[in-house]
């Protein structure tokens, strides 16, 4: 009777251990996949991410927003000329150089509006170049080797009793659910950022039309800061995912396996939280509202 019970116990242990190893291997593979996906998506410029959306947004901007920007530009430059004249002692101290100055500022303003898309895309090209260089380093340094990380875990697990193995199997299954949640968080943050990028770029001509005016120019400068914040948010996303991969890489299963699993769970929850903070951190760095 004991022989039969031992065989059942051994079979059940093997089943649980293989399930735990499979869950953890799947987790590490999922992390490698998410790091690669994050690098591929956040390192893409708006025109390369989805050509159809990009062309639609550009068409809306050029045909709908640019005429409005032209009206705003006309109003601002008229106001600028009036302020220039009034500032010179209410026209008593008149200087013809003012007109040349006003013409130059008007020319610069028109240049900003007509080259809006070149300016906006240049910002994202710079950010994309930074992310591309960083992703090459991050992916190479943070790739998780499941075989190396799991090591001799299988032998250690086989030495455990059925009860603790059930607990570890449940915890490792929970890790699979958290890996799925992590995928959702990365999807929301990355794709939400791209949609926000398209929304911000669609109205680019309006803030660009205000760049040369002292009072209204804050709108344009803040818009440029917002663009840089959006662009470099991609770099912060890469940093967050890379830190997570390194933390998981540093978890040692040689001691308490349960503690290692819960540590990994904690890191996963922490990553989900920090991913949603990347936008506010980027805006804080570039002082964008």
Where are these regions (language model features)?
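Binding/recognition "hotspot" determinant
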Residues: 1-72
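Long, low-complexity, intrinsically disordered extramembrane tails
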Residues: 1-2, 283-289
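Hydrophobic, aromatic-rich alpha-helical transmembrane segments
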Residues: 60-64, 95-99, 103, 165, ...
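Hydrophobic transmembrane alpha-helix segments characteristic of membrane transport
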Residues: 72-110, 203-217
């Amino acid at each position: 009777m004991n022989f039969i019970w031992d065989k059942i116990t051994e079979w059940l242990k093997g089943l649980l251990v293989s399930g735990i190893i499979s869950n953890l291997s799947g987790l590490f593979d999922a992390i490698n996949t998410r790091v690669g996906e994050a690098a591929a998506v956040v390192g893409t410029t708006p025109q390369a991410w989805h050509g159809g959306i990009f062309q639609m947004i550009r068409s809306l901007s050029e045909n709908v927003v640019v005429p409005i920007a032209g009206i705003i530009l006309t109003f601002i430059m008229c106001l600028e000329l009036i302020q220039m004249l009034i500032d010179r002692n209410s026209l008593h101290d008149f200087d013809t150089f003012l007109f040349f100055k006003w013409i130059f500022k008007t020319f610069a303003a028109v240049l900003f509006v007509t080259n809006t898309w070149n300016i906006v895309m240049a910002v994202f090209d710079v950010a994309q170049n930074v992310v591309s260089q960083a992703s090459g380093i991050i992916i190479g340094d943070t790739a998780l080797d499941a075989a190396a990380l799991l090591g001799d875990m299988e032998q250690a697990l086989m030495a455990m009793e059925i009860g603790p193995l059930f607990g570890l199997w449940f915890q490792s299954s929970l890790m699979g659910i958290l890996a799925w949640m992590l995928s959702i968080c990365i999807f929301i943050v990355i794709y939400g950022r791209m949609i926000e990028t398209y929304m911000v770029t669609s109205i680019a001509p309006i803030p660009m039309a205000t760049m040369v005016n002292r009072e209204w120019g804050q709108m344009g400068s803040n818009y440029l800061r917002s663009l840089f914040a959006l662009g470099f948010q991609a770099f912060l996303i890469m940093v967050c995912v890379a830190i997570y991969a390194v933390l998981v890489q540093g978890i040692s299963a040689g001691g308490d396996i349960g503690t290692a699993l819960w540590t990994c769970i904690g890191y996963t929850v922490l990553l989900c939280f920090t991913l949603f903070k990347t936008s506010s951190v980027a805006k804080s760095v570039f002082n964008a509202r």
